[in-house]
């Protein structure tokens, strides 16, 4: 009899462990509907002349305190070079959710850190994003992402896993099977890169983003969170201004309230003067000056008009 009970207990143990993990995991639909996401790279982090300056835990805490009055959820791009400090700082400040990013799906450090962080912060980390536009840039392959996906899944059966690419890859038939394996769609939908784009036409730009999101939802069954979209606030020589940036975000938030199946994350937290040089390495052929100006806050931590614009829209809901 004792032997039978022991065998029964061993058989039920995995189910019990899974149930505990599921109970701790955040509800994706509820988070998408209620969270105020923003993509976040610490101001203390930079890449200059090929040299990476890691983010500091003190700098991260300062950043998250500044963001907290208007945002309660974060999307990061890496979990190495200091960004592994983000979840602990966010938890102390009462953030609702984090989508932890892995920049390089082949990085052993990032893979191990993502697993460790998700286990340590099960109520905070809602998903892990394995890569950002690296398939499009040909820095890694779908097979690389899938390999890391399955490795993390074995360790974290209840955490949503995904990746992030430009929206047009999701619409190519050769990628349908790949993206269908993801638990969440996390596309980047940038109207600024379309040939028809006009910085002063906020309504058309916002409508484009939401139409693309709807098209993706008609193709895939998963919930969708637009990871990147928006307008940079400069440089003025390119036609981008703080007023145009603010108008776009006011328009897209007016047109689309978040739901359990679709939401839009703000992009991004802070200006990053070092990004144009790095972007030129990824995508040569342009100076990419606007990459320094996507922030809702300047590199000095000063809020732009867009912050007040989204606050006013949210206040009317």
Q: Predicted regions: what is each one?
A:
Residues 84-168:
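Substrate-binding cleft of extracellular glycoside hydrolase catalytic domains
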Residues 192-193, 218-248, 268-276:
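Active-site clefts of carbohydrate-active enzymes
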């Amino acid at each position: 009899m004792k032997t039978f009970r022991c065998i029964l207990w061993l058989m039920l143990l995995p189910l019990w462990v899974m149930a505990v993990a599921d109970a701790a995991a955040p509800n994706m639909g509820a988070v998408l509907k209620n969270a105020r996401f923003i993509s976040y790279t610490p101001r203390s982090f930079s890449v200059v002349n090929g040299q990476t300056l890691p983010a500091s835990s003190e700098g991260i805490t300062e950043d998250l305190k500044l963001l907290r009055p208007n945002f309660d959820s974060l999307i990061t791009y890496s979990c190495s070079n200091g960004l592994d400090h983000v979840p602990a700082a966010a938890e102390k400040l009462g953030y609702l959710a984090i989508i932890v990013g892995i920049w390089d799906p082949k990085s052993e450090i990032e893979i191990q850190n993502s697993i460790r962080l998700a286990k340590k912060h099960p109520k905070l980390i809602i998903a892990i994003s394995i890569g950002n536009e690296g398939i499009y840039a040909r820095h890694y392959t779908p097979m690389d992402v899938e390999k890391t996906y399955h490795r993390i899944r074995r360790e974290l059966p209840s955490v949503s896993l995904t990746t992030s690419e430009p929206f047009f890859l999701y619409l190519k038939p050769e990628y349908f099977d790949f993206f269908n394996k993801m638990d969440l769609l996390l596309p980047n939908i940038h109207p600024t890169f379309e040939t028809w784009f006009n910085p002063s036409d906020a309504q058309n730009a916002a409508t484009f983003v939401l139409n693309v999101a709807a098209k993706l939802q008609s193709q895939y069954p998963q919930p969708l969170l637009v990871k990147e979209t928006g307008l940079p606030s400069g440089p003025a020589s390119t036609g981008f201004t703080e007023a145009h940036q603010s108008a776009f975000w006011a328009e897209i938030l007016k047109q689309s309230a978040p739901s359990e199946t679709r939401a839009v994350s703000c992009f991004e937290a802070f200006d990053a003067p070092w990004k144009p040089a790095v972007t030129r390495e990824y995508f040569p052929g342009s100076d990419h000056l606007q990459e320094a100006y996507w922030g809702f806050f300047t590199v000095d931590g000063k809020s732009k008009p867009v912050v007040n614009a989204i606050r006013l829209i949210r206040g009317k809901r």
